[in-house]
Curated annotation (Swiss-Prot):
Its cofactor is Zn(2+). HAMAP family: YabA (MF_01159). It comes from the Bacteria. This is Replication initiation control protein YabA. It comes from Staphylococcus aureus (strain JH9). GO terms for cellular component: nucleoid. The gene is yabA. Keywords: Cytoplasm, DNA replication, DNA replication inhibitor, Metal-binding, Zinc. It is found in: Cytoplasm, Nucleoid.
Length: 115
């Protein structure tokens, strides 16, 4: 291999790495959007259940149905955490809790909201 071939391979490798980095960033942004939407829908669903007075989960009885799993009731503190996250603060466990996110999304914080 001469220098030109090595240089061309390095250039192609750099282009591939840049493309992978771009695609990874896009996937991360999409995952964050989906988790945020899921959390918002869960909170909205919980609030609607409270308004309707339907706190008990609905189950469908069938001959082959398994016993329903216990559904966690959402804690009112989760709403407060969602508000804090919306204002730009970390709510994830550990050293970052309470620190400003500087406009960046945090998958750990979103995991706390989705639990």
């Amino acid at each position: 291999m001469d220098r030109n071939e090595i240089f061309e391979k390095i250039m192609r490798l750099e282009m591939n790495v840049n493309q992978l980095s771009k695609e990874t960033s896009e996937l991360k942004a999409h995952a964050v959007e989906l988790v945020e939407e899921n959390v918002a829908l869960q909170l909205e669903n919980d609030n609607l259940k409270k308004v309707l007075g339907n706190d008990e989960p609905t189950t469908i009885d069938t001959a082959n149905s398994k016993p329903a799993k216990a559904v966690k009731k959402p804690l009112p503190s989760k709403d407060n955490l969602a508000i804090l996250y919306g204002e730009g603060f970390h709510i994830c466990k550990g050293e970052l809790f309470g620190k400003h996110r500087h406009g960046e999304d945090c998958l750990f914080c979103l995991e706390v909201l989705s639990d």
